[in-house]
C-alpha cells in the first residue's frame, strides 16, 4: 500500500533518523530521501509535507548540499531544521553568515507572534540549539515568529507559502515541546491524516509476503535477536512451514545462549534446524588478531556453513533478512561518509545461491519491530534482549580467540548480565557486556602474587545505537560485580569500567 509520507530530506544530520521516527510516533508515515533527490521523484511520492534536516555544512560554502530550487514550487509545506532553516533562507534570497557567537546546548525560546505551529505551547520554553552559522537577513515574504537570546531568527515563516524554519532541533528530547511543534507542523500546517499503525502494517505485510512468495520456500538464518526472530514469526504467520529457519552455533556465543535461543525459537513454533559449526569457526580463527580480519573470516565461514545447510532445502527461492530502515538509509549514505566497520550479515549469499531477498522490515525502525513483536505475541524477554554482534564474542576478546579465553569471557559476561537483571538495571541500558583485554596485571590473592587477565565492563545508554553515552551505574553495584568476577572467574584479577561515549568511541571494542 502506497502511503502519503512526510518526507525528511537528509543533509547529513546525525539526527535525521530521529526526525523520521518522531513523525512516525505521531502517526504519519515518514521516509528519508537524499538532498539531491530529483524534484520529479519527490512529486511522485505526493508528500503531505517536507522536512529539511540539519547538517554539518555551511550553506555559503562551495559544494554545500542544496536541493533543487524547484522544491519550493511544489506547493508542499516545508519545515527547515537548523541547517534546513539556513538552506531555505539562502536559496530564497536571505543571508546566512558565520556566527561570532556560536550556540550549542539549551536555549530559551520566546514566542513573539501567535501561529498554528505554537498551538498549545507556552510563550517561553527550553529548546536545543547546535549551530555555528546564523541568519542575518530574511528572504522576502518571511517574518520572525520566535527568538532566543542569541538567535533573533529562532523561528521564521512564510505563512502564505507554508514554509517554516526552526533554528533549534525539535526532534531531540532536550527541546521540551519539540514533539508538539512537530505535531503542529504535521497536522496543523500540512493537514496530514494518520496513516501509520503497526496493526495495519502486520495485516498488509502478511498479504504482501503471501503474494510475493507464492508456492516457493523461504530460508532464514536466525540469531535469536529481535529483528530476525520477529521477521521469522511474521513470515511464518504468512506462509507456515514453507519457511525453513537455521540457527548456526559458531562457538562464539554467550553462556548457555544456544540452549536459550533454541528454546525461545521453538516455543514460537518456528521450524528450526540447529547447526553446530563451532570447531570449524574456531579452527579458521586460529592465530588471527586483527579485528577486521576476524569479522571477515566469520562472515565468510558463516556463508559457507549456511549455504551448505540451505542447499538441502529443495525449492528455496527466497532468503529472509531482518534488514531495518537505518540499514537502508546508511547503505544509501551521504556522499563521502567513511566505512567504520565491516557489518556481519549474510551479505553476498543471495547472489551466490540465486536467491531473492525477502525483507519485511526494510521500512521500519527497531522500536517499531519491537511493537510488531509484541502484537505477534513474541515474549518480552526476546523483545528486550540487548543487541549482540554477529561475530559474537570474537570481537569482545581483543586479539586471538581461543577456547580458554572464550570460557573466561563467558563467565564474566554472565555475572555482569545476571547482576544487571537482579538489580533491575538491564532494561535501563541499551547494551551491556564484558570485554577480555589482551593485557595481564599484577594482583594479590590470599597473600600470593598473581599475574592474570583484565576484564573491561561496558554499559551504554542509547536510543538507536548510532550515538551512545556510558551508563552511570551505581558504585556499589559495580563493586559487587567486580568482586564476583574476580572471585568466581579463574584467570582474572582486575576489572575496569569503560566510560567512553560514542562518538568518539564505538560501542563495541572491535
UniProtKB/Swiss-Prot annotation:
Catalytic activity: XMP + L-glutamine + ATP + H2O = GMP + L-glutamate + AMP + diphosphate + 2 H(+)
Start and end residues of each Glutamine amidotransferase type-1 domain: 5-195
EC numbers: 6.3.5.2
Species this protein is from: Aquifex aeolicus (strain VF5)
Domain GMPS ATP-PPase: start-end pairs: 196-385
Taxonomy, superkingdom: Bacteria
Pfam families: GATase, GMP_synt_C, NAD_synthase
Recorded metabolic or biological pathway in which this protein acts: Purine metabolism; GMP biosynthesis; GMP from XMP (L-Gln route): step 1/1
Keyword entries, A-Z: ATP-binding, Glutamine amidotransferase, GMP biosynthesis, Ligase, Nucleotide-binding, Purine biosynthesis
Gene of this entry: guaA
Subunit details: Homodimer.
Name of the protein in its database record: GMP synthase [glutamine-hydrolyzing]
Amino acid at each position: 500500500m502506497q502511503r502519503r509520507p512526510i518526507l525528511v530530506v537528509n543533509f547529513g544530520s546525525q539526527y535525521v533518523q530521529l526526525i523520521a521516527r518522531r513523525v512516525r510516533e505521531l502517526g504519519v508515515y515518514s521516509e528519508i530521501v537524499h538532498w539531491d533527490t530529483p524534484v520529479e521523484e519527490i512529486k511522485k511520492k505526493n508528500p503531505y509535507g517536507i522536512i529539511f534536516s540539519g547538517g554539518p555544512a555551511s550553506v555559503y560554502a562551495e559544494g554545500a548540499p542544496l536541493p533543487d530550487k524547484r522544491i519550493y514550487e511544489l506547493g508542499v509545506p516545508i519545515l527547515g531544521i537548523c541547517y534546513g532553516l539556513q538552506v531555505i533562507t539562502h536559496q530564497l534570497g536571505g543571508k546566512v553568515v558565520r556566527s561570532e557567537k556560536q550556540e550549542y546546548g539549551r536555549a530559551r525560546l520566546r514566542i513573539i507572534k501567535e501561529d498554528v505551529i505554537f498551538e498549545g505551547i507556552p510563550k517561553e520554553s527550553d529548546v536545543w540549539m547546535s549551530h555555528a552559522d546564523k541568519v542575518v537577513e530574511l528572504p522576502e515574504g518571511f517574518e520572525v515568529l520566535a527568538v532566543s537570546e542569541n538567535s533573533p531568527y529562532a523561528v521564521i515563516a512564510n505563512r502564505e507559502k507554508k514554509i517554516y524554519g526552526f533554528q533549534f532541533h525539535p526532534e531531540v528530547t532536550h527541546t521540551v515541546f519539540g514533539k508538539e511543534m512537530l505535531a503542529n507542523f504535521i497536522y496543523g500546517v500540512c493537514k496530514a491524516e494518520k496513516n501509520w499503525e503497526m496493526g495495519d502494517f502486520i495485516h498488509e505485510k502478511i498479504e504482501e509476503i503471501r503474494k510475493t512468495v507464492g508456492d516457493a520456500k523461504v530460508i532464514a538464518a536466525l540469531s535469536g535477536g529481535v529483528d530476525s526472530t520477529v521477521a521469522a514469526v511474521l513470515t511464518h504467520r504468512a506462509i507456515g512451514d514453507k519457511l525453513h529457519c537455521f540457527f548456526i552455533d559458531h562457538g562464539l556465543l554467550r553462556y548457555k545462549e544456544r540452549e536459550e535461543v533454541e528454546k525461545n525459537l521453538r516455543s514460537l513454533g518456528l521450524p528450526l534446524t540447529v547447526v553446530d559449526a563451532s570447531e570449524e569457526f574456531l579452527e579458521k580463527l586460529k592465530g588471527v588478531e586483527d579485528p577486521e580480519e576476524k569479522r571477515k573470516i566469520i562472515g565468510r565461514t558463516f556463508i559457507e556453513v549456511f549455504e551448505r545447510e540451505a542447499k538441502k532445502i529443495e525449492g528455496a527461492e527466497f532468503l529472509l533478512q531482518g534488514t531495518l530502515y537505518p540499514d537502508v538509509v546508511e547503505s544509501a549514505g551521504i556522499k563521502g561518509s567513511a566505512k567504520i566497520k565491516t557489518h556481519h550479515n549474510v551479505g553476498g549469499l543471495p547472489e551466490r545461491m540465486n536467491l531473492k531477498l525477502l525483507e519485511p522490515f526494510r521500512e521500519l525502525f527497531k522500536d517499531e519491530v519491537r511493537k510488531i513483536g509484541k502484537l505477534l505475541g513474541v515474549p518480552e524477554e526476546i523483545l528486550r534482549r540487548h543487541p549482540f554482534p554477529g561475530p559474537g564474542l570474537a570481537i569482545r576478546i581483543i586479539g586471538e580467540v581461543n577456547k580458554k579465553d572464550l570460557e573466561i569471557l563467558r563467565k564474566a559476561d554472565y555475572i555482569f548480565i545476571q547482576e544487571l537483571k537482579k538489580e533491575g538495571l538491564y532494561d535501563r541500558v541499551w547494551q551491556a557486556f564484558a570485554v577480555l583485554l589482551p593485557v595481564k596485571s599484577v594482583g594479590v590473592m590470599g597473600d600470593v602474587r598473581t599475574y592474570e587477565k583484565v576484564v573491561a565492563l561496558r554499559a551504554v545508554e542509547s536510543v538507536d545505537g548510532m550515538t551512545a553515552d556510558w551508563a552511570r551505574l551505581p558504585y556499589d553495584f559495580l563493586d559487587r560485580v567486580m568482586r564476583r568476577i574476580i572471585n568466581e572467574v579463574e584467570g582474572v584479577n582486575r576489572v575496569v569500567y569503560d566510560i567512553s561515549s560514542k562518538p568518539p568511541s564505538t560501542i563495541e571494542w572491535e
